[in-house]
Amino acid sequence: MAKEILTFLTGISTRDGDKFPVLISAISKVSESEHRGLLNVITELRKENTPIANHIANHIDSFTNYDFAHLLFSDGTAKNTISLDNQLNIIQVADLVLPDKDTTFDEYTTIELLSVAMLIVISTFALDFIHSDRSIFKIVDLDEAWAFLNVAQGETLSNKLVRAGRAMQAGVYFVTQSSGDVAKESLKNNIGLKFAFRSTDINEIKQTLEFFGIDKDDENNQKRLRDLENGQCLLQDLYGRVGVVQIHPVFEELLHAFDTRPPVQRNEVE
């Protein structure tokens, strides 16, 4: 993982016969040490004290000053890190600035490079989690999944997650605002269960109905999606059957925990 992240950030490829061996050597030394962290790779490079090693060290160090860079760079002594042994891991990264799908790698800004690197780390952890004990059903929930699906690397990683999930008894949940966010056919074809909540936008309604594989121009189908009440959704099961289901929260605490309404609106309703 360290090799993938640092070569991605620095743009050093295996074809670079001068820089690549120096970087890999430093990473290998850190991986064999007691404290394994990307900051220590910078230290190891500076110990070499050669023009190439110092250049690479300075390049890597230039990424460490950004707000969420500490999630990638540490000295190897961090505690309370994410672990596959935990029953629940929640990873919140609110400041990711992911590039548009059409943006070329050469056009990435520094913050976009870091954001994609963070996405790669999160997805790799999710893949490791999926590939753990096959006898246990596991869930990977990607909230605001449009952010992942709107960047080329995220779309590729999402496909890997879904394919691995089917083989390793894991469910991958894509939670997003629009069915149009799931644009790639290969990903669509690997999604088993589909849930769609009320929409009043006719274009979004037609897009959702098409995603479900039912007649998007049928007025009854459109009305059914438009007239859904709170707590109801359109569901397509594993066999392709489509119907309206009502969701009843078993515990009131869960209802409050996942209530995303602003406090003012919540108080008015109460």
Predicted features by range, described:
Residues 1-163, 225-229, 233-238:
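P-loop NTPase motor domains
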Residues 1-36, 182-270:
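P-loop NTPase motor core of the ASCE superfamily
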Residues 101-222, 248-251, 257:
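Conserved P-loop NTPase motor cores
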